[in-house]
């Protein structure tokens, strides 16, 4: 009879397979299925916010702000959701009315807005985005661009029901 040889490495490998299997049997969800967690409000996201910013087709040219809005949990795209966008641009600071506008999402949950080039404000090139209607929890985002010379920025929302 051959006796199996167990060293520390083979023991830990075998034990980890067992633990992973127990996690799946106990209702564990693979990481991919958990990717639609509700989007959390970012610190400073609501700075210079103006309620009910008007729906606009564009706020200038040269920079593209875009993203996808989904239902938290399921990842279902949300159509007709109003997203507000504002930033400091070549037109002026975040308080400049020409830098504030809202857009509606398409059937696939996508939104986009062409605007003037975003410029650094307090040393960081960034945008502000908001969802604040009644159907879902309010979310304010403040994504920072990797470089002030970037000409696009994407910010996605996973909205939790209110």
Tell me what each language-model feature is:
Residues 1-10, 19-25:
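N-terminal secretory signal peptides
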Residues 18-19, 74:
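Generic hydrophobic alpha-helical segments
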Residues 35-162:
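Beta-strand-dominated extracellular/periplasmic modules and repeats
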């Amino acid at each position: 009879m051959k006796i199996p040889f167990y060293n520390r490495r083979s023991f830990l490998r075998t034990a980890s397979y067992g633990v992973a299997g127990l996690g799946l049997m106990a209702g564990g969800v693979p990481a991919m299925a958990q990717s639609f967690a509700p989007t959390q409000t970012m610190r400073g996201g609501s700075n210079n916010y103006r309620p009910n910013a008007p729906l606009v087709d564009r706020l200038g040219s040269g920079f593209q702000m875009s993203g996808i809005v989904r239902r938290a949990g399921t990842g279902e795209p949300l159509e007709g959701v109003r997203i507000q966008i504002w930033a400091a641009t070549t037109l002026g600071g975040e308080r400049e009315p020409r830098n504030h506008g809202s857009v509606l999402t398409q059937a696939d949950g996508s939104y986009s807005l062409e605007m003037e080039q975003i410029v650094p404000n307090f040393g960081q090139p960034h945008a502000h985005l908001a969802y604040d209607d009644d159907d879902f929890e309010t979310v304010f985002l403040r994504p920072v661009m990797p470089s002030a010379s970037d000409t696009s920025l994407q910010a996605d929302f996973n909205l939790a029901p209110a």
